[in-house]
Amino acid sequence: MRRLLYSCLFALMASSSVAQELVIRDVFRQMPDSLMPYLSTNNRLDFMDFLDSKMKAEIKNQFDGKSEMTALTDDSLSIRMNDALRVDMLLLKLDEPLDTISYVLVLAETFKTDSVYGDKSIKFFTPQWQQIRRDIPWNDIQRKRINSLGLQNILKWDEEIINRG
């Protein structure tokens, strides 16, 4: 009887710790429209539904153009907003909380200026979409992932151009 009780308690504790893990789709779903005027809430939900159904995640955006979510994992996503703008997001768990913040969302926008270079803008948010304007204690792996976003975007554009041709 005691073993059964301990087993049940262990299973309950394990399931509650899993339930607390945050994934990027939950944060993306709650994103304010003002931060990404290209996409409505329904557009964002459609992206995830299409990818979950193994379909191409392309939608008509708010400016009558086409936008496509090209990747979605538990901690990252990529969206080609149009031919000149790509958005990447990373959801990174901090090794040690910053005040009450355990996760930070990295929002990287890369504006293509020519075939080789792009202008990159990176902002940091809490999972509740409050912008963070202070130093964040990244570990080395997190820092490398953030720094790779700009180059990754440019390489993806070149690959898309080659694949279209």
Give residue spans per PLM region:
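Short, hydrophobic/aromatic-rich segments at coil-to-beta transitions
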Residues: 74-77, 101-105
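Structural signature of eukaryotic scaffold interfaces centered on beta-propeller domains
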Residues: 89-99, 156-165
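Short loop/turn segments immediately following beta-strands, especially the blade-tip
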Residues: 127-136
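Short aromatic loop motif centered on NTY/YTY
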Residues: 135-165
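Short beta-strand elements that form the blades of beta-propeller/WD-repeat-like
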Residues: 102-112, 165
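Bacterial Sec-dependent N-terminal signal peptides
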Residues: 1-24
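Structural motif
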Residues: 114-124
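Terminal domain-start segments
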Residues: 20-96
